[in-house]
Amino acid sequence: MRPWSLGEYKMNLLGIGMVFRGGRGIDCYENALKQGWQPPVECEIRHLNKRLPVYVVADETLADKLLLKKMRRADRFSKMAVLAAADALRDSGLESDGQRTGVILATSFGAHQTTFDFLDDIIDYGEGQVSPTIFSNSVHNAAVSYITSVLDITGPTLTVTRFSFAFQSALQLAQLWLADRRCDSVLVGAADQCGEVMRYIFDRKLF
């Protein structure tokens, strides 16, 4: 018998969803490509008398009350991930079987803005006064838990965290799940955000 390799197992891309500075969805992405490069906005960094260029997702882009009604206490990182995941599932045209659908989220830094907000609160208010909601949103798997809750998915879920090639690793894992028949389809995504600490590091190390 000829040995079987994972590279022989082909995957199909069925749907795409995205949330970015230019808006939400394929149409917004197509418009952004047609417009070409757009200058970033400048955001101020606390503790530094400087402003740095960043691409910011507008608040109105995240204003989907129907979809986000279950996650009023979620942070921006999780909201962006949920909206993109819901759009990808809708774009695929699949009638999702929640038990046979997997979810893999790739991220380099996770919800690091929320993580540092939590640490700041410990310093400012002490361990006994920190909001448990902020802590629950700071863990790397929080966004995936929101995705599965909002989309009623009960299949295997995982967050892949790597500083480099996180999305490629997530695709490899999805390929394994499909080859092993753990699920019939896998929702694979990548999410990261530029928080205050990241802007500080960017200023100190890259400028």
Describe each model-derived feature in a short phrase.
Residues 1-156, 168, 176-179, 191-195, ...:
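Conserved "HGTGT" condensation-loop signature of ketosynthase/thiolase-family condensing enzymes
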Residues 159-165:
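Short beta->alpha junction loops
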